[in-house]
Every structure is written in C-alpha cells, then in structure tokens.
Amino acid sequence: VNSLVKEASRAGESVGLTVDRLAIDGGIPLKGRIEVRGAKNLVTKAMVASLLGETPSLLRSVPDISDVRVVRGLLEVHGVTVTEGAEPGDLILDPTNVRSAHMADIDAHAGSSRIPILFCGPLLHQLGEAFIPDLGGCRIGDRPIDFHLDALRRFGAVVDKLPSGIRITAPHGLRGAHIELPYPSVGATEQVLLTATRAKGITELRNAAIEPEIMDLIAILQKMGAIISVEPNRVILIEGVDKLDGYT
C-alpha cells in the first residue's frame, strides 16, 4: 500500500497522477470543516431566475468564476442591481428597475457564452422583448439554439433575425404550450421552465432533462411561487402564475 501511495505521490509531483489504481489505507476517522461553494451549473441559472421576481433575491455561496461574472454583467446592463451580501459569496439581486439593454452591451458582456438565450423568457415577461447577440455560431439553424427558439415560438414569441443578432418579442403575451423536446436538452428544459412559470395557462414539457441542476432550478422557482410538478417519463407540468417573488 505504502509503495503505491509513494508512487502516486511522485507521479503527481512530476506530471500528475498517472497510475490507474490507487490503494487507500483507511480506518482513520476524519474531521474538520470545509467550505463548499455553489455549483456553477445551478448558480448562473438561479441568477437568471431572479429576473422573474418582483422582489430582490438572495443567493448564497456564489463562486467567483467567469460564468458568474458574465451573468452578473448581463443582469446589470438590464437594470438589475447586484450587490454583495453580508457574508462572503452572498449576492443580492434586485430586478425592480429592469430595462432593455443595447445589443452592443449584451454582446460585450456575453462574449462567447450562450447564457443570454436563457434571459429571453424572463425578459419577455418583464419587458415584452429580448435580444440575443450573434455569438459566433449561435444562429438560427444551429441546432442547440434552435431548440430554445422553437420552444419560445410555441409560447407565442416572435423571432426576428437582425444583422447584429436575434430580436424576440411577445406582442400578445406568452401562453402555456405542449412541448416535446427532440432530446432531453438541459438548456432547452431550463428555457421552458424559465418561460412557462409566468405564461398564461398550463405548459406540458415532454422528454425533459432531469439532471440534478434541473431539479434544483425547479426547487428555486417553486420557492419563488411557481407551480411545477415532475411526472414520470420525463414529463414536467408548469402552471403559469401572475407574479413571483424573489428567493432567499
């Protein structure tokens, strides 16, 4: 055992762990405290979800990573006030003064990230329009974004291609829809959840993704006042509500 551990240690010090097996001599009780930051895949979507609330949200244990900084910048150009909380890693997100943003500002903050597509549902509810910059390959006809756009159209959104990106409007508001995804896409499932929670009527989503971050996003939306149930066989039902509150 000791020789294997020493071998792994030497390998790790030089070029990284290269052995295909590591023997651990257990039996020694472990104790202590570690700080666990929020999961990236959930934190950024929770930040976007704050746009749906009519009161501020408090998000705890936010990791200081590039994706979080991108979403923070996008929220701020849309008028959301983002401030540090009392504890390290706390963010307070206040959407009271949400407003439309210029395409150039969205593009500057988004970089190559596709996160702006998830802003569409919340912004359509709040402002009646949303913009997606040309993200280099993120275009109509590109399958990943097409799933999002097709879902938004099912809710009643109108999608227009502009030289600088995509403009999405909801001239008659958003209404519940029956949607079946071509495959259980995590991003498209998040899109439907973020859009359906305040759409009029009931949305039935079939072939939904059911990864842990989806369940966590559902829990956050439910905490805000959304009515969502997860059924067998990858079916999610969402009953739209008129208003949502912030989460803590």
Regions found by a protein language model. Give the residues of each.
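Structural preference for solvent-exposed beta-strand-turn elements
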Residues: V1-T248
